[in-house]
Amino acid sequence: MGFKCGIIGLPNVGKSTLFNLLTKGNSAVANFPFCTIKPNIGIVPVIDERINNLNQIVSPQKTVNAFIEFIDIAGLVKGASQGEGLGNQFLGNIRDVHAIAHVVRCFKDDNITHIYNQVQPIKDIDIINSELILSDFDLCEKTILKLQKKTLLKNKETQEKINTLKKCLNHLKQFFMLKTLNLNKTEKQLISYLRFLTLKPTMYIANINEEKESYYFLDKLNEIAKKEGSIVIPIHANLELDLVKMSDEEKKSFMKLFNIKTLGLNSIISSGYHLLNLITFFTVGDKEIRAWAIPNGSTSIEAAHKIHSDFSKGFIRAQIIKYVDFITYKSEAKIKEMGKFRTEGKQYYIQDGDIIHFLFNV
């Protein structure tokens, strides 16, 4: 299973430009709404310096990074939850992702139309978030009615679901996102199958330019994100798209000339990884070094299954080397000599950076 991050926002805010930047592809970028009708899916590698360091020691035939799927979802409009602008289809696409990258236009440009004829980032956010809230409200209300019709109403879990959903419904009724509702772990598990849109972890991508007004908009965006526990990543999407096309030498010179210290692109990828609460483990061999993305809190049996179902079915044990030990001692023999080689069972919790060799028998 790939971990999916959906790129959403109003039409003409820079979603497809961002998608092109992430994938270095050529998704159609057009100055009119609904240019992207079917979601474009891009497999984006997660840049990790550790895999480069391992590569220098082992010199394998092949190196494979962990990845995230970014999905460019067509622009939403006011009334999407009622079907406006193919809204139901697009909202359904969002429900399938694990996290959201909400692109917000924070620049003025007379050559790029705004669907509501005025650049107002805060209002734009309200439009999108309101549609997500209304969609969740509708789903929540229908699910409560469905559960109440069940003959097994005395079932404890069903009643707990109803109680939790009523709590959610009341919060949504006040036009609050569910991520701002204080739900405990059990309550979240009870309703997880519904994949509520306003519970999904979100990062706001502020598409800026070099004008001062962009930074005024950016400050306002940060205020909203802070209230709901989201993050904001500023990016000059068109500028960075030009940078992607340059050679490394040209890129360095350009960044130095315009005093660009870090690229928003890298922040988006790493933040997507963080939003999805993922960690990385490595498999290391002469043929291949591979980084694997798994949810934080995964056990060794779950990590084994990530590689292949046979690994988990016939699991015997996992041999663990810490990344820092591998980099320090550079050979398995030396690692064993220093007492840094460990064997773990099925319920060992994988730590970020673990290098694992699975022993199994099918």
Curated annotation (Swiss-Prot):
Keyword terms of this UniProt record: ATP-binding, Magnesium, Metal-binding, Nucleotide-binding
Function: ATPase that binds to both the 70S ribosome and the 50S ribosomal subunit in a nucleotide-independent manner.
InterPro entries according to UniProt: ATPase_YchF/OLA1, Beta-grasp_dom_sf, G_OBG, GTP-bd, P-loop_NTPase, TGS, TGS-like, TGS-like_dom_sf
Gene Ontology terms: cellular component: cytoplasm
CDD domains referenced in this protein's UniProt entry, alphabetically: TGS_YchF_OLA1 (cd04867), YchF (cd01900)
Residue spans crossing the bilayer: none
Cofactor entry: Mg(2+)
Gene name of the encoded protein: ychF
Organism: Buchnera aphidicola subsp. Acyrthosiphon pisum (strain APS)
Binding site for Mg(2+): S16, T36
The name this protein goes by in its record: Ribosome-binding ATPase YchF
Residue ranges annotated for the OBG-type G domain, each copy included: 3-255
Pfam families for the chain: MMR_HSR1 (PF01926), YchF-GTPase_C (PF06071)
